[in-house]
């Protein structure tokens, strides 16, 4: 690998926004490292390599501290640097608040917020030593507006946005930028699963629930994962060199309504 080649770690890389982001960074010349609990993430890395890029997949549960530490160390030892961290991995919980179990609360918090914490914790020593780096956390429109049956998902996303702002100030002396991106509805397996749960719970046809969600976007459609991956790359680029502590709503006007 060229000593000038930059390295990006993307979590939740097996599908959806994470897979699209991994491909975009590889297209821009990065060594694109994907982490996901799903083994299918290997397919994304293989596709990148077949197209002449540099992709690597490591199976990882972002809520498992030992495994996160191992994966970050492996990347750091192999490449000698970590330039970008995209904290994308997460889960959604769709359930009335008073029906949420303590175990569901812990799982949602551990993966969504805990995963961000662990990746930041173990990547930061590399970025501090380099005196450079970019962290992009995954917020959500749910961190800005209230949604019925999405209390825990929204709570974790709101916490991620708050963590982003505080961490941006803490890491500024090390020339490390920290931002979050908050998508609206994106056509991913997670969103389709969310719609299916709501459809089943309310006995409403899937297509009707889907159309209601699409109506929340100004363009009356869901985003393609690439439409989130490209803004993520911009936040990591030199074009965003004066941007830190920001949350970028890529929600097709949802919150502006």
Where would I find each of the regions flagged by the language model?
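Residue(s) in the substrate-gating loop at a strand-loop-helix junction
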Residues: 140
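C-terminal substrate-recognition "lid" of short-chain dehydrogenase/reductases
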Residues: 117, 221-250, 255
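Substrate-binding pocket helix/loop in short-chain dehydrogenase/reductase
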Residues: 96-97, 104-109, 213
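Alpha-helical segment proximal to the catalytic Tyr-Lys
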Residues: 125, 169-173, 241
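Active-site helix of classical SDR
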Residues: 120, 156, 164
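Conserved glycine-rich cofactor-binding loop
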Residues: 14-15
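Conserved glycine-rich Rossmann-like NAD(P)H-binding loop of the short-chain dehydrogenase/reductase
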Residues: 28-43
């Amino acid at each position: 690998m060229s000593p000038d080649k930059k390295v990006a770690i993307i979590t939740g890389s097996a599908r959806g926004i994470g897979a699209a982001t991994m491909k975009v960074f590889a297209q821009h010349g990065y060594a694109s490292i994907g982490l996901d609990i799903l083994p299918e993430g290997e397919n994304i890395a293989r596709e990148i390599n077949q197209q002449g890029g540099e992709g690597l997949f490591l199976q990882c549960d972002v809520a498992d501290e030992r495994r996160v530490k191992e994966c970050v160390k492996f990347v750091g030892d192999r490449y000698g640097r970590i330039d970008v961290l995209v904290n994308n991995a997460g889960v959604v919980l769709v359930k009335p608040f008073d029906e949420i179990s303590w175990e569901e609360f812990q799982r949602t918090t551990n993966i969504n917020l805990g995963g961000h914490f662990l990746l930041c914790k173990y990547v930061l020593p590399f970025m501090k030593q380099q005196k450079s780096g970019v962290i992009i956390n995954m917020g959500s429109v749910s961190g800005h507006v209230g949604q019925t049956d999405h209390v825990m998902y929204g709570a974790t996303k709101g916490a991620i946005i708050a963590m982003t702002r505080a961490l941006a100030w803490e890491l500024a002396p090390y020339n490390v930028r920290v931002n979050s991106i908050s998508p609206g509805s994106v056509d991913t397996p997670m969103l389709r699963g969310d719609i299916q749960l709501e459809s089943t719970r309310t006995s409403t046809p899937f297509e009707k629930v889907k159309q209601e969600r699409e109506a929340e976007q100004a363009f009356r459609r869901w985003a393609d994962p690439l439409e989130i991956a490209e803004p993520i790359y911009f936040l990591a680029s030199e074009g965003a060199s004066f941007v830190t502590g920001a949350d970028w709503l890529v929600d097709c006007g949802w919150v502006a309504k």
